[in-house]
C-alpha cells in the first residue's frame, strides 16, 4: 500500500508533445538497448567539446524544454536529452531505479557510442532530474553537475508539498540529493528561483551547505520553479557558460 501511494505522489509521467523540439535542429534517436531499455532521446550536436546531458523534471518530457535547448544552442553546447521509462515516447513504467538506469544508459551512450570523454560531460538536472543527476555523479565520472530547482530529499519535499498527509514520513527515504552532494567530487552549480513555491529556496541553501568541494549557488531573482533560465537572462547564461567551459572545456 505504501509503495502504491509513494509512486502516485512521486511519478507523474507526461506524454504530451509541448512543441519544444520543433524549431531546433536535432536528431530524434532511441537509446538504452544495452541496458534493456527503449528510451526516446533528442540529440543536439554542436561544435563544443563539452556536452550537456539533460535530465528533465517530473510532469514533463523532452518536448517541454525549448528554453534550455535554445540556451545550450546559443552557448554552442552539444546536448543529449532523453525521456525516462514511461515518460514521453519512452517505453516502460516509471520507478526510482528505472530513472537511475536510464541516466546510466544515456551516459554510456555518450561515452561508449559517441566516444565522449566523461570529463567533458556536464550533467544538468531540473527538479526531480537533479536527483537523477546527483545519483549518477555520486558513482560515475563526469566533468561537472548543474542542478536547477532541486529538493533535498523525498521526505523533505513530501512533507512540504503534502503537509496534510503525515503518511509521507513513513515512506522510504529516496532521491537523496543532500547525501549525494556530500560525496560528489565533481564541481557543482546549484540554480534556484527566488520565488519557487514548489521547492523552497531554503532547500537550495541546505544543498549548498552540505555539498562537497567546488560549488556555486545562484538564486535567480523573480524566478519560480520552471523559469530560471528565462528570468536569469544573460547574467545567468554567462555563469552557466563560464562554469561548463571551466570544468568541461569549450
Label for each model-derived stretch:
Residues 1-32:
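An N-terminal hydrophobic leader/cap segment in hydrolases
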Residues 49-57:
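Short beta-strand element of the alpha/beta-hydrolase
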Residues 58-71, 84, 93:
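The serine-hydrolase catalytic nucleophile loop
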Residues 73-91:
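Conserved alpha/beta-hydrolase
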Residues 94-114, 179:
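Alpha/beta-hydrolase active-site loop
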Residues 109-113, 119-163:
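Primarily recognizes the serine-hydrolase "nucleophile elbow" in alpha/beta-hydrolase
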Residues 183-185, 190-192, 196:
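Short beta-strand/loop motif that positions the catalytic acidic residue
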Residues 223-233:
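Catalytic histidine-centered segment of alpha/beta-hydrolase-like enzymes
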Amino acid at each position: 500500500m505504501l509503495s502504491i501511494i509513494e509512486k502516485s505522489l512521486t511519478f507523474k509521467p507526461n506524454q504530451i508533445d509541448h512543441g519544444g523540439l520543433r524549431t531546433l535542429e536535432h536528431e530524434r534517436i532511441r537509446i538504452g538497448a544495452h541496458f534493456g531499455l527503449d528510451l526516446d532521446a533528442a540529440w543536439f550536436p554542436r561544435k563544443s567539446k563539452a556536452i550537456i546531458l539533460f535530465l528533465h523534471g517530473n510532469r514533463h518530457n523532452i518536448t517541454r524544454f525549448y528554453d534550455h535547448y535554445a540556451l545550450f544552442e546559443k552557448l554552442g553546447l552539444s546536448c543529449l536529452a532523453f525521456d525516462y521509462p514511461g515518460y514521453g515516447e519512452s517505453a516502460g513504467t516509471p520507478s526510482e531505479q528505472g530513472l537511475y538506469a536510464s541516466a546510466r544508459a544515456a551516459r554510456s551512450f555518450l561515452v561508449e557510442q559517441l566516444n565522449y570523454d566523461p570529463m567533458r560531460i556536464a550533467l544538468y538536472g531540473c527538479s526531480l532530474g537533479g536527483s537523477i543527476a546527483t545519483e549518477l555523479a555520486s558513482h560515475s565520472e563526469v566533468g561537472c553537475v548543474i542542478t536547477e530547482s532541486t529538493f533535498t530529499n523525498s521526505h523533505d519535499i513530501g512533507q512540504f508539498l503534502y503537509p496534510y498527509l503525515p503518511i509521507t514520513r513513513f515512506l522510504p527515504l529516496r532521491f537523496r540529493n543532500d547525501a549525494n552532494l556530500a560525496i560528489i567530487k565533481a564541481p557543482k552549480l546549484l540554480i534556484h528561483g527566488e520565488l519557487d513555491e514548489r521547492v523552497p529556496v531554503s532547500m537550495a541553501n541546505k544543498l549548498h551547505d552540505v555539498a562537497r568541494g567546488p560549488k556555486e549557488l545562484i538564486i535567480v531573482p523573480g524566478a519560480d520553479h520552471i523559469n530560471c533560465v528565462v528570468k536569469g537572462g544573460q547574467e545567468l547564461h554567462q555563469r552557466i557558460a563560464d562554469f561548463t567551459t571551466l570544468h568541461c572545456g569549450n
